[in-house]
Design a protein with these regions (language model features):
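A short beta-alpha structural unit
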Residues: 188-198, 224-231
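Short beta-strand segments
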Residues: 27-30, 66, 91-97, 259-262
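Condensing-enzyme catalytic core mediating Claisen C-C bond formation in acyl metabolism
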Residues: 109-182, 188-189, 265, 271-276
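Alpha-helical metal-binding/catalytic segments enriched in His/Glu/Asp
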Residues: 76, 129-137, 240, 244
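Short acidic/glycine-rich loop or secondary-structure boundary segments that cap or lie
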Residues: 101-102, 154-157, 198-201
Length: 276
């Protein structure tokens, strides 16, 4: 995990533009504690080991966020609080995770969640490290602004027998839209963590049908997991990177983006972005 996360964080350090790293908090997102096969004790030692690898010492406000896929959204919210309330110049949000360990793969196989020649309703496991540098708006062209974040809890999880109504995702998306001061109809497209399982696409469709109140000819959904595999806690910085690259290279569907994320345990999160 150290060697997945460190190169991505190093790129953020290279963009600090004179800011002392000792004044930069690092919010490091990792797998949720109840994930089968998860490495023991990563909350206790991974942050320090990454600092040793990079040869730097981040601000003491740095911490590990052990909340899986939705952890990155919590970290983005936390970074905003640190920047605006703690008056930090910037903050790094990083995520690192792997599904390529025996215990994790065995649990996924038992629940028939891996994509195989005999199971089309599954995903390809992967591993990744990703990081983004967040700061206050500068007004420069090419910026991607976080307008809002919201969170929810879903009772009908992927392993439950309850009927899915996307209550948790609706709650998360509405929270993000309220904070952004926008409606669903104002947004141009979506980038999500759906990984190929039918559950995720169904949840996204249900949430959209329950919130969207205007007719839209199209409302694209991008899913980077198709390219990188299921990468758990690394997905939020990856999605932010995809959105930023698309904005700067002018291939986004439009400037306003809804990003949403889901954990197996029911945690839900959404972020609204806007390119400037």
């Amino acid at each position: 995990l150290i060697h997945l996360a460190a190169p991505a964080i190093r790129e953020c350090l290279a963009a600090l533009d004179g800011v002392d790293v000792a004044h930069v908090p690092l919010l490091l997102c990792v797998a949720e504690p109840n994930r089968p096969g998860r490495f023991d004790g990563i909350e206790d030692h991974l942050l320090g080991e990454i600092q040793d690898e990079l040869g730097v010492q981040f601000h003491r406000s740095s911490k590990v966020v052990a909340r899986g896929r939705t952890g990155g959204a919590l970290a983005v919210k936390g970074a905003a609080d640190l920047i605006y309330r703690g008056r930090f110049p910037v903050c790094i949000v990083a995520g690192v995770d792997t599904y390529l360990v025996a215990g994790t793969l065995a649990a996924l196989e038992r629940n028939q969640r891996l994509l195989t020649s005999e199971n089309s309703n599954g995903f390809i496991p992967g591993e990744a490290g990703a990081a983004v540098l967040l700061g206050p708006p500068t007004g420069k062209s090419g910026e991607l602004q976080v307008l809002g974040a919201g969170f929810g809890k879903e009772a009908a999880t992927i392993l439950s027998e309850e009927p899915l109504r996307a209550e948790g995702m609706v709650q998360a998306i509405k929270g993000a839209l309220t904070e952004a001061g926008l409606s669903m109809g104002d947004l141009d497209f979506r980038i999500t963590d759906v990984n190929g399982e039918q559950y995720g696409f169904k949840e996204a469709a249900l949430a959209l049908s329950r919130i969207l109140r205007v007719r839209k000819e199209e409302f694209d959904i991008w899913h980077p997991v198709e390219c990188v595999g299921e990468v758990g806690a690394a997905i939020v910085p990856i999605v932010l990177g995809v959105a930023l690259a698309g904005h700067r290279k002018d291939y986004l569907v439009g400037p306003k983006v809804l990003c949403h994320f889901a954990n197996d345990d029911g945690d839900r999160a959404a972020i609204v972005l806007q390119g400037k």
